[in-house]
């Protein structure tokens, strides 16, 4: 594989704090630069790049969708032209979708007194929506987001960009306690599958508690996160290093450090994309319309080397 593209993929794979949309945009930039350096890309090059993106962040739908576009291009008679068109569409959606989601979010908050919002982890789309609606938000409460501390990043950005918003940080274990005082639990998603959405581990418990006490759960994600069943079947939820939990753990101690979990769609959960509010049934129809390359499943395995 092209070494500059390889370095870009490796940097994306190592990133533990950026949201899926941010990483996908970086991936699009790297792929478009690669395509310009190699105006005629071979089928093998496309499939090698597809494999690299499949394994870089295997729980994040936009990167899996980009891998799918690379695999689809490999079977085209004019792969370079197909790839340029698909990357242009993908990049445009990633650039413009956050503003559309932010507009819908602002309208949903209404014009009554400013609200308290609970959020979890870090999502660039959620952050942009909150900042755009700062005149209608009194306070945002978020937890640390251990072990990678993405919640701190969220709070730092709100303090820097969300003038007038009260920023409050708490522990992961205590975040649910403040849901009763909030207008809504607002989270992002790394993937939107047919039966549920994938986000940071711990999201499911927050959603269950919010639903139990009657608080709305809003999932903000653009349509690059839509994940067809055939791609979801090869997706994997990565576990982190033991050292992120305990740097010098005792021998014989097993450490479980899941990064992601799937939360099923349920009453109280509303999905907001750039197209507006979506029901699970609407999501399923849109997901089923996405073309999936038959080559994708085989690419999960490392390429054969002779």
Where do the PLM segments sit?
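Gly/Ser/Thr-rich loops at beta-strand to alpha-helix junctions
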Residues: 20-21, 117-126, 147-148
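Short helix-capping/linker segments at secondary-structure and domain boundaries
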Residues: 34-41, 74-78, 135-136, 268-272, ...
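Non-catalytic, soluble scaffold/interaction modules
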Residues: 48-75, 86-98, 120, 233-252, ...
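Ligand-binding beta-strand-loop-alpha-helix segment within the catalytic cores
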Residues: 71-115, 131, 135-185
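Short hydrophobic segments within beta-strands
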Residues: 118-120, 143, 220
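Histidine-anchored nucleotide/phosphate-binding helix
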Residues: 123-134, 207
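Conserved phosphate- and dinucleotide-binding cores of soluble alpha/beta proteins
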Residues: 137, 145-306
